[in-house]
Amino acid sequence: EQEKCDKIYANKILKLPDKEKNNVGFTCTGLYWDKEEEYFFIGNAGKYKPNDKTFQASIEIVEKDFSIIKGDIPCYLKFENMRDIQGVTKSIDGTIWLCSYGENKVRHIDEKGNEIGYFDIKEPSGIANDSRSNTLWILTNNYLYNCSYDGVVQKTVKIHIKGQDQLFLDEKNDLIYFSAGADYHGDSYIYTVDLKTNRAKPLYVLKDSYAIEGITIVDDVLYVLNDGYYHDAETSVNQVNIYFLNKIQTKENYQ
């Protein structure tokens, strides 16, 4: 049953910067804002289209204004069984955790992409580091888990929303935000989970994010990645949709 929530439109939409191919950006997945370094870490699934032969999954390090790729971590060169990459996050020590969905693993790497460790978890998509407890929040197809860094599950919340995917943790308000939607020609959703009650509820209907992927909130601004080119979605562009949460647009009115 769909609770009432705001239907919102992006205040700003930016194309993702190009990698090997011109004018298509890249197939974006997880999104993490590194506030120390002031740039975004973005998962790149490593295929432009579903029928490309092999995955070349990497993490792209992208300028705050999404203008250029500053650097990358080519995960596929280190992990030969790796297929796509989904969520990415960093812990306080600067090391990186990522969801290797096709391998059913959460991988732990350094900033050069070298392996530190991994643990097994079925179908991990979203991940967020919790600096309050030095643990990880991981979203799968059926559950939200809180895990220690060695993969021991400390808390399980059953969540099953169609197309649930990526996570953002708001430590201050003890809330998890997650993206959901797999229509590609219709609405996508942002849900919250109140970690005090473990209750999930829809917060926003995103009217113009057709191929929703990673999400993050920085200074009251919601960033939503869309890999529309890969999915041939209603808007078939790899882009970031930017929503000003203190100036919510409830009808089309692009800047």
Each language-model region and where it sits:
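Structural motif
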Residues: K49-I61, N104-H108, Y143-C147, H185-Y191, ...
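Blade-level signature of beta-propeller repeat domains, shared across WD40, Kelch, NHL, RCC1
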Residues: A128, E213-Q255
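Conserved beta-propeller blade signature
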Residues: Y39-I42, I96-L98, T135-I138, L175-F178, ...
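Loop/turn-rich, solvent-exposed surfaces of beta-rich toroidal or solenoidal domains
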Residues: K78-N104, I161-T192
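Short loop/turn segments that connect beta-strands within beta-propeller blades
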Residues: Q2, E63-S67, I109-N114, S148-V152, ...
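Short loop/turn segments immediately following the C-termini of beta-strands
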Residues: N44-K47, Y101-G102, N141, G181-D183, ...
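Repeated scaffold domains used in trafficking and secretory/extracellular systems
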Residues: N23-Y32, N81-V88, K122-S131, I161-D170, ...
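Surface loop/turn motifs at the tips and blade-to-blade linkers of beta-strand repeat domains
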Residues: L14-V24, I73-N81, Y118-K122, V157-K162, ...
